[in-house]
């Protein structure tokens, strides 16, 4: 039992020593020991005398042996022996043979011994020592109490040194390595616990063998100083045991000292890699540097940031964002923004800089020369000259005569497509929805006077963009005017397009077979538009035609051939192909297809094309009869496949070296378009929010690109101060599942023009409650959109007075409340209508009439001059003399 108690005491001392060293209290203890040794009051001699006096008083018998021994050690009282003994070693116990009455005196003197008070220690240091030695003092108190209750015999004391001297440095090594709460390895602290100067250790070991008694007294005094005030001292039996230490114990202590020296030297010579090394806490010379973590990587980063400098010369393309420009200049975006703000220009990191002057000024401020890269512009515009300029600059020997491109233009239902059918001997007009042309047709037809390339343009007002493209592409414009109706709005628009493009105009006055045909009216209208006909002495050729009877068609062809001969239309078939997109669509089996018209050069199968925002490689090429072609000569319209996307109608195209070059060009163009789009980013319409305007959101799908343009143009032209129209997206093809989901999320209406709904998207329309409208005729679509816009407007409420009654008396009812006896003074009071109470020309209440009675019978209405009983709905504050007005609320729909 005593062995386990001693082992536990040893572990507690080891732990206390570790904590003392970690808290830096070992130095404090050394200072306290020095202060105590220098103090005369706390000298070993005085303490021994005090102990002797107290023992004499208690026992009543003299004790000469302790008195003589303590006097002999008076000269060595100031020697400190703290370094020669490890705090982890067991306390030495000496086996001696005491005199006859010595043991009796010692056992009786135990309760009378008290620890001397240390006067040289401040209260703060004393409290700190109490905290660190609490566990050891408690163990000593338990030990003293056990010794007081059961005094041991001298034979028992002789057995204790064998048990208490088994402590070796191995007990320190057996402690499991672990990290403390600060992340430092505990081995570092253990290695420092045994540190002591080598010279002092050697001197202490020599003095242990020669001068045992002074060392024992010093150690006893040192142990007494370590005890805090207020605690009991060691038993008196320990004093004589120190004086009678055997030589065997001296040998054991010397061995333990040499082992500790070897362990210290091994720790100092070979230092293990600990957690402090991992976290960089062992670097530095001073004690504070060892506890401070060195963050080398952060200091390196800061040094690198200061090293980075702005380059002297950079090359960029405009437009460019502030963030991208700062990255090119190796600067922070905040520095550029600050510099711009100082000079009165407010920008954020995502704003776009498109001014060359501003960009060059920024570079000048930071000492950087900025060069604008124009190679992107060269890719954006492959050729600067037009097709006509290119033909005029070509060697005349390479030029050949090409067939004329003729565009038939005019008002809707004036017979353009019918005349073309008569020339081609086909029936295209019957296949058009609503018997009106809504697409641009391009095809070649063989006539007795040669081949003619015909463009059939829509006549509806919504297709002005198509008519404009037709006027730009063609060589001759055939202006079709109905002789019975004369010139209309779209006819005037077609004339303006032709004049703007400086194109020859031939007027075909159609429907000459009708009885109300009046050619003079048409001549007069043409003259008013500065188109003086040849019959009136002008230069404009006019021909009377009839598509039904075929009258005048041959004369029309001859006139076209004559005009083409006068124009001397030529082209270079050996040049690379250039032309325009007439129409484009998304085919289910072929993908993106486009009808293109070759204006110059020859287009071959397998060549790479570049459009405005897409590219392609010609995989197949068909004519209007769906025959496969290997090449297309000038003035030939063909249908091509193999495109990366759907090109827009009217986009020019040109042949490039290969598909790789075409892809690079389009990538550069798309990057430029994104930067331009950032400049023209749509701002929210705060005016519409303040005015509380309704917004109709639309998703448009059509069969061809031209139809989308026409429909969007017509929708945006609907003027309304109450409703705005916003087109969320538009595309070519059938209405897909993604379109339905987008419409559901944004609460939009889907408009389909000449298209249908995909099969797997139809169930979503009902599940998500999305409104989908399909149209084949454009003006039907426009009318339907106007109705939808009108439906968004809240109806206007109008109050119509029906009659009035005056309250003559009031009657209280426990079940119904207040019943008003009234006389109808005006009109008719009708049940289930609205009532307002008026007093002194002010409306007090508005509500409904819940009950109307006449002579205890429920009636629907009471006319003027009759009395009735009226019960109001949840109102009982009316008085005699108030006027009850009966009125009806009528809602009227608003108009755009």
UniProtKB/Swiss-Prot annotation:
Organism expressing this protein natively: Chlamydia trachomatis serovar L2 (strain ATCC VR-902B / DSM 19102 / 434/Bu)
Function, as annotated: One of the essential components for the initiation of protein synthesis. Protects formylmethionyl-tRNA from spontaneous hydrolysis and promotes its binding to the 30S ribosomal subunits. Also involved in the hydrolysis of GTP during the formation of the 70S ribosomal complex.
Low complexity bias (residue ranges): 203-214, 228-241
Ranges of biased composition (kind: Polar residues): 35-48, 215-227
Chain segments carrying region G3: 456-459
Span list, region G4: 510-513
Record gene name: infB
Record-annotated tr-type G domain positions: 401-570
UniProt region (G5), positions on chain: 546-548
InterPro entries: EF-G-like_DII (IPR053905), EFTu-like_2 (IPR004161), IF2_II (IPR044145), IF2_N (IPR006847), P-loop_NTPase (IPR027417), Small_GTP-bd (IPR005225), T_Tr_GTP-bd_dom (IPR000795), TF_IF2_bacterial-like (IPR000178)
Region called G1, residue ranges: 410-417
Protein name: Translation initiation factor IF-2
